Amino acid sequence: MRHARGYRRLNRTHEHRKALFANMAGSLIEHEQIKTTLPKAKELRPIVEKLITLAKRGDLHARRQAASQLKQHAYVAKLFDVLGPRYAERQGGYVRIMKAGFRYGDMAPMAIIEFVDRDVDAKGAADKAREAADEDAL
């Protein structure tokens, strides 16, 4: 019986899972939309929702708690400066999961996880900035 099993192991060790979700949460915060497998998306949702709740609090302790979960300080800065104020009036439900078919290689169910009311220009913004910098260098 699987009673009281709190989360999926995803065939990884605890440290590997922790690093996986830290990286995925950072990517979601940076791009505001990512495509991944459905079980990973379902496990990522509560992690990101709790990070947004920390960003809504906005105090120093909340910032340090978020920094302990995320890999880069740029993610923490965007979380507290952009996403926290954006969802200040919303009581939960910051993330949406949409099914996206099956992966070609192994038929794994795929999903798109994104922020509700996301900034559509955020996805690919780093690539656009890098291309603009390359054009300026020429």
Swiss-Prot record:
Any one GO BP annotation for this protein: translation
UniProt superkingdom: Bacteria
Cited InterPro entries: Ribosomal_bL17 (IPR000456), Ribosomal_bL17_CS (IPR047859), Ribosomal_bL17_sf (IPR036373)
Record keywords: Ribonucleoprotein, Ribosomal protein
GO CC terms of this entry: cytosolic large ribosomal subunit
Any one Gene Ontology molecular-function term assigned to this protein's record: structural constituent of ribosome
HAMAP family: Ribosomal_bL17 (MF_01368)
Assembly and interaction partners: Part of the 50S ribosomal subunit. Contacts protein L32.
Family stated for the protein in its record: Belongs to the bacterial ribosomal protein bL17 family.
Name of the protein in question: Large ribosomal subunit protein bL17
Provenance organism: Dinoroseobacter shibae (strain DSM 16493 / NCIMB 14021 / DFL 12)
